[in-house]
């Protein structure tokens, strides 16, 4: 899942 808010994926 990725978060455009922090720009990271896990």
Swiss-Prot record:
Pro-4 adopts a trans conformation. It is found in: Secreted. One of its GO terms (cellular component) is extracellular region. Concentration-dependent partial inhibitor of Cav3.2/CACNA1H (IC(50)=1.18 uM) and Cav3.3/CACNA1I (IC(50)=0.49 uM) depolarized currents. In vivo, in a mouse model of post-surgical pain, it produces antiallodynia for both mechanical and thermal pain. This is Omega-buthitoxin-Hf1a. Disulfide bonds join 2-9. One of its GO terms (molecular function) is toxin activity. Signal peptide: none annotated. Its main location: secreted. It comes from Hottentotta franzwerneri (Alligator backed scorpion). It comes from the Eukaryota. Expressed by the venom gland. Keywords: Amidation, Calcium channel impairing toxin, Disulfide bond, Ion channel impairing toxin, Secreted, Toxin, Voltage-gated calcium channel impairing toxin.
